[in-house]
UniProtKB/Swiss-Prot annotation:
The lineage of its organism: Bacteria, Pseudomonadati, Pseudomonadota, Gammaproteobacteria, Pseudomonadales. InterPro entries: Cell_div_ZipA, ZipA_FtsZ-bd_C, ZipA_FtsZ-bd_C_sf. It comes from Pseudomonas paraeruginosa (strain DSM 24068 / PA7). Belongs to the ZipA family. GO terms for biological process: division septum assembly; FtsZ-dependent cytokinesis. Interacts with FtsZ via their C-terminal domains. Essential cell division protein that stabilizes the FtsZ protofilaments by cross-linking them and that serves as a cytoplasmic membrane anchor for the Z ring. Also required for the recruitment to the septal ring of downstream cell division proteins. NCBIfam families: septum_zipA (TIGR02205). This is Cell division protein ZipA. It is a single-pass type I membrane protein. It is found in: Cell inner membrane. Residues 100-114 have a biased composition (Acidic residues).
């Protein structure tokens, strides 16, 4: 049976229709489970940008999270006292006994004169702060050291007739954390850098009782006196232990002899007696507060 042109056209049409139906069925099946996005026609007129299209059409990327970095301009201004403390943190390799961790929560009070000038738009807030500082000023002035009831003294007397030489004495006490300060004598603060409250002090046991750093090379003394006042540091027992360690170090390294306040030999029993005096003083102070 011969197939005419008409029959061939019918067969070809059926094949085309079947192909279209099959392709549509394949597309519908392949589109299942995919999210459909409705394009906004308002973006149709935007200029093409290869960089942006790559961001939009490309695969999802995991962006690494980075902590914000700060340069020196981002950092808040600090007072001169804080700057000195930070410089003090970069101490050179000097032998030390270590700082007392007496109160981790304690922060040094900022000096109002060191504060930065406020910006002009914030005059209202700055006035409020100044008023608060003025209100606090009397309380700060009132927080003066209380009168001393007792003084614990440890004398270190040189065994050599030439006494303690200035340079060696200075090196020794600096290693123990004492720093030259008020009244031209040395003081041991909470921090080895000379910050914080005074724990104890060291004076020249020979009149006039002071030290001359300008002439320290020619200086010598037969004895020095370590002393701790009560009431004084917030933790007097720990401060006393540091004072005993500094006195023993000086006596051991510079050939000295430890004496008590009566110039008698300082024994272990005498040291325990000093500690008991501290305990008794603390007990009396608590009783008075009640």
């Amino acid at each position: 049976m011969d197939i005419g042109l008409r029959e061939w056209l019918i067969v070809i049409g059926l094949i085309v229709i079947a192909g279209i139906l099959f392709d549509g069925w394949r597309r519908m099946r392949g589109g299942k489970g995919k999210l459909k996005f409705k394009l906004d026609r308002s973006f149709a007129n935007l200029p093409d940008d290869d960089g942006d299209s790559a961001e939009l059409l490309g695969p999802a990327r995991v962006v690494e999270h980075r902590e914000p970095s700060f340069d020196e301009q981002d950092l808040p201004s600090v007072s001169a006292r804080e700057g000195k403390e930070r410089k003090g943190g970069k101490r050179q390799d000097e032998p030390r006994q270590g700082d007392l961790d007496l109160d981790e929560g304690m922060a040094l009070e900022a000096d109002p004169s060191d504060a930065a000038e406020p910006l002009e738009p914030r005059k209202g807030k700055s006035k409020g702060r100044k008023e608060k500082e003025r209100e606090k000023a009397p309380s700060v002035a009132a927080a003066e050291p209380a009168p001393v009831d007792e003084v614990l003294i440890i004398n270190v007397i040189a065994r050599d007739e030439s006494g303690f030489k200035g340079p060696a004495l200075l090196q020794n006490i600096l290693e123990s954390g004492l720093r030259f300060g008020d009244m031209d004598i040395f003081h041991r603060h909470e921090s080895m850098a000379g910050n914080g409250e005074i724990l104890f002090s060291m004076a020249n046991a020979v009149k006039p009782g002071t030290f001359d750093l300008d002439d320290i090379d020619n200086f010598s003394t037969r004895a020095v006196s370590f002393f701790l006042g009560l009431p004084g540091p917030r933790h007097p027992k720990q401060a006393f232990d540091v004072m005993v360690a500094a006195a023993r170090k000086l006596a051991h390294e510079l050939n000295g002899e430890l004496k008590d306040e009566q110039r008698s030999v300082l024994t272990a029993q005498t040291i325990e007696h000093y500690r008991q005096r501290i305990i008794d003083h603390e007990r009396r102070s608590l009783m008075q507060k009640r």
